Amino acid sequence: MSIDSALNWDGEMTVTRFDRETGAHFVIRLDSTQLGPAAGGTRAAQYSQLADALTDAGKLAGAMTLKMAVSNLPMGGGKSVIALPAPRHSIDPSTWARILRIHAENIDKLSGNYWTGPDVNTNSADMDTLNDTTEFVFGRSLERGGAGSSAFTTAVGVFEAMKATVAHRGLGSLDGLTVLVQGLGAVGGSLASLAAEAGAQLLVADTDTERVAHAVALGHTAVALEDVLSTPCDVFAPCAMGGVITTEVARTLDCSVVAGAANNVIADEAASDILHARGILYAPDFVANAGGAIHLVGREVLGWSESVVHERAVAIGDTLNQVFEISDNDGVTPDEAARTLAGRRAREASTTTATA
């Protein structure tokens, strides 16, 4: 992808920076501040070119705008991407500390128009480090006055989304269904446990062989990484990186439901159309995985109790039922229906704010 096409984006702001000493590129993209300051996690990963990092940040920021709106949260959408010069695990502590300090400086210069939190390859400890330089950070450790990890709340929301999608697809409950979980990290691992407790038969895959071995020891079945997208299952739960369902994959995916925690699971609109035409019911990711945003914004901005946050995460299932109702009534894909619902809620929130 060219840098020109990556910059052809309709969001509000793009901030980039390069650090010669570490070789890291920094990207912050603010998609919308209509409902409040933009918010979105910090993702650290390797990219083949800067254009890919810009595109990833833009897509993720857009998803955050939708996620905040559909969840009735008073924030906009943004995202940070740190394009690393080497795999995260190979970066020494002093280099990582410098990378985080520079990222915090970039955030602080935005003067509260953007807040960040943990994402791929960043955690609460990293948020504590960012907080040494800037106040505009979610997901700090409990010891630093933050809400801690949002992983379990995210998993709860995805689990409720999965149950709602399975029920709407006419499959009843998860009991006895085969669920393939791709990615056994903090969210995917918790989701797998919840699905197993509900009686699902689990197939699991992860790049981390220790995670897979642990799952197998619990009685689950491992699937080779190269076989994930061709293995038959009732429910496919992508919980790793996004973009896994391309048009080619959508034509051959052998499942009835797609409901996972990964962001931007569907690579493009055509893939969504193909899934819909084939009768594969997809839980739009920005609805299904909103539990993390609910946890961080609810606890650290709105002052919600743990019980209220949990209730709001469980209510993701109800939100999906509204999405499916719009999809059925209007004859559109669930993704289009979810965007319609997000737009409706954003307009309602804007009207309420304007008349308050």
Swiss-Prot record:
The active site is at K79. It catalyses: L-phenylalanine + NAD(+) + H2O = 3-phenylpyruvate + NH4(+) + NADH + H(+). GO terms for molecular function: nucleotide binding; phenylalanine dehydrogenase activity. One of its GO terms (biological process) is L-phenylalanine biosynthetic process. It is an enzyme of class 1 (oxidoreductase). Subject to competitive inhibition by 3-phenylpropionate for the conversion of L-phenylalanine to phenylpyruvate. Subject to competitive inhibition by D-phenylalanine for the conversion of phenylpyruvate to L-phenylalanine. Pathway: Amino-acid biosynthesis; L-phenylalanine biosynthesis; L-phenylalanine from phenylpyruvate (PDH route): step 1/1. Keywords: NAD, Nucleotide-binding, Oxidoreductase. Disulfide bonds: none annotated. L-phenylalanine binds at K67, P118, D119, N263. NAD(+) binds at residues 43, 119, 150, 154, 183-189, 206-207, 211, 240-241, 261-263. Its EC number is 1.4.1.20. SMART domains: ELFV_dehydrog. It comes from the Bacteria. Signal peptide: none annotated. Gene3D superfamilies: Leucine Dehydrogenase, chain A, domain 1, NAD(P)-binding Rossmann-like Domain. Homotetramer, dimer of dimers. Belongs to the Glu/Leu/Phe/Val dehydrogenases family. Catalyzes the reversible NAD(+)-dependent oxidative deamination of L-phenylalanine to phenylpyruvate. This is Phenylalanine dehydrogenase. It comes from Rhodococcus sp. The lineage of its organism: Bacteria, Bacillati, Actinomycetota, Actinomycetes, Mycobacteriales. The gene is pdh.
